[in-house]
Amino acid sequence: MIDILRDSKTIAVVGFSSRESRAGYYVPAYLQQQGYQIIPVNPYLEGEPLGETPYPDLQSVPVPVDLALIFQRSENVPPFVDDAIEIGANAIWMQLGIRRDAAAAKAKAAGLQVVMDRCALVEHRRLRAQQVL
């Protein structure tokens, strides 16, 4: 987890939400404030959330993605993991409450680092407080 947060620069947020009260918005907003490049991924987004161009899917993202941060129901995760593998992402992070063991195993077998059922905001703050990041 430390390596993922330390080494990632570009984070594609699958399931980015335009609602500020949802974790799919405020977690990436926090990460952007910490210096990460955030790429919203959601086919239904309009405008430029957080000042960034949104993309309908991971394959449409025109830059290399270090981390695919997933805000989707657990049962919906497998195709996003497949997409992350296909585009050459370095890691998959399934947000708090999201776990899909078979998809995680597939990602690991493809060489990706995987985090499941953890909040990226909480973990980033915790690691910063420990002066690890």
Model-derived regions, located:
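Conserved beta-strand elements of the Class I
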Residues: 11-14
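Mid-chain, well-packed structural core segment of small domains
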Residues: 58-98
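A short helix->loop->beta-strand "cap" motif at the edges of active sites that frequently abuts
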Residues: 34-36, 87-91, 110-112
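NAD(P)-binding Rossmann-fold cofactor-contacting core
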Residues: 17-22, 29-49
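Rossmann-fold NAD(P)-binding glycine/threonine-rich loop
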Residues: 96-124, 129-130
